[in-house]
Amino acid sequence: LNNITLACIDSVQPDKAKKAMNRCKEHFDFGGEVFINDPQINSRQAYNKFILQELHKHIHTDFVLIVQWDGFIINPDAWNDQFLDYDYIGAVWHWHPMGRRVGNGGFSLRSKRLCELTASPEFVYTDHNEDDQICHLNRIYLENQGIRFAPEELARYFSFERELSNIKTFGFHGDFNFERLGLY
């Protein structure tokens, strides 16, 4: 995956975060790697601000795969090149309205262009989680800039979070899934 940077930003559980990154690197050669353990990124708000306003400066490939200590690759054989046809793909949020369910940012694939747009002055920054700001609050702005969100049908093969299914997904997010996946 030489056009994808593997990225993790974590100053709360850096050892677990590095382990998650290493799990991903066992299966793929990435075009870049970013691990940021900055003591100033110590809250949800600081994390959101960094992801939305600073991450693009660290990405030198067309895409970035964001992983967290509790969200990483679990089925490398489930990789699909169609994931790269979109600027954003993450796990489906079943509680959002149809057509707006993609998705979770804890394990997500994003284009560098999307990351640059989230740092632009036109992107309305709020105190919501960064993935909600991208996928809901600023979605119309982003789509007007040509950003493409993956369809729910494809996102179900990329990752899962709260929605349980029998699909063998590429990755997952959420420590509440560890037991189900046999991860400890």
Where are these regions (language model features)?
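Short glycine-/acidic-enriched loop or helix-start segments at secondary-structure transitions
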Residues: 18, 74-78, 119
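Short, solvent-exposed loop/turn segments at secondary-structure junctions
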Residues: 11-14, 39-41, 70-73, 94-96, ...
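Short, conserved loop/helix-junction motifs that constitute active-site signature segments
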Residues: 28, 58-59, 80-84, 110
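Generic structural signal for small/hydrophobic residues in well-ordered secondary structure
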Residues: 33, 69-70, 111, 134
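Conserved donor-nucleotide/metal-binding helix-loop-beta segment in metal-dependent transferases, i.e.
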Residues: 71-102
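Short beta-strand-to-loop acidic/aromatic patch adjacent to the donor-nucleotide binding site
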Residues: 61-73
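N-terminal anchoring/stem segment of glycosyltransferases
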Residues: 1-63
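Catalytic core and acceptor-binding pocket of nucleotide-sugar-dependent glycosyltransferases
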Residues: 102-184
